[in-house]
């Protein structure tokens, strides 16, 4: 019977079956040739969002020559970076004839910045901008509450709640001056006994409205 070895092809024996024994010793030889399409796998693991563990993202089923060294090639994944130092990494190995070689590569999840900014004129008394946040790729982001400023209407932030992309995000908002901001005009009358004006009595008060942070002038009665 022919000899066998996992991942190899046997050449066959050098003599056919059933030969007649000559008057001398006989050595029958055979050889093995490594198969060129022996199977092995490369597994690609991505870091979890919730913790520092990893989840299998992709498996490559590849072939190569038995008992030669296979080296895994890192792939490009949006929002992830290859980490050649991650625990459990098997970047290269001998292609076993039985197809049992499994190479393993790990990719850490990138983090990006979420920044808030006002555009246009920022009125006095405007809410402080939310602090910059560093967020992992794929994480849910809750946008801050609307900003406020006395006498102004806020446009709203430029984004609603979103899933963190593989890039920094700047969220903007602006203020518009209200046109119905109230102000008061007080008309004071001279005292009957002297030339003074009493701030608390003999006064006519008007409540008017106008655009915040614009100049106005009182009209005499």
Q: Residues of each region from the PLM?
A:
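Secondary-structure capping and domain/repeat boundary segments
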Residues: 1-221
């Amino acid at each position: 019977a022919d000899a066998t070895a996992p991942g190899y092809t046997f050449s066959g024996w050098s003599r056919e079956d059933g030969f007649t024994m000559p008057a001398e010793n006989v050595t029958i030889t055979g050889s093995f040739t490594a198969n060129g399409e022996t199977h092995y796998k490369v597994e690609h693991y991505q870091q979890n969002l919730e913790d520092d563990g990893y989840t299998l993202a992709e498996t490559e089923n590849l072939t190569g020559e038995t008992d030669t060294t296979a080296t895994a090639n890192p792939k490009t994944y949006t929002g992830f970076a290859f980490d050649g130092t991650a625990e459990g990494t098997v970047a290269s190995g001998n292609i076993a004839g039985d197809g049992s070689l499994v190479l393993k590569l790990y990719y850490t999840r990138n983090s990006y910045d979420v920044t808030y900014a006002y555009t246009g004129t920022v009125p006095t008394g405007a809410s402080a901008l939310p602090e910059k946040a560093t967020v992992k790729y794929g994480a849910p982001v809750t946008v801050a509450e609307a900003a406020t400023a006395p006498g102004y209407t806020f446009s709203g932030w430029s984004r609603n709640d979103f899933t963190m992309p593989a890039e920094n995000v700047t969220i903007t908002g602006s203020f518009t001056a209200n046109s119905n901001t109230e102000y008061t005009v007080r008309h004071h009358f001279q005292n009957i006994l002297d030339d003074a004006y009493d701030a608390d009595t003999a006064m006519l008060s008007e409540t008017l409205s106008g655009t915040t942070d614009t100049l106005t002038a009182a009209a005499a009665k």
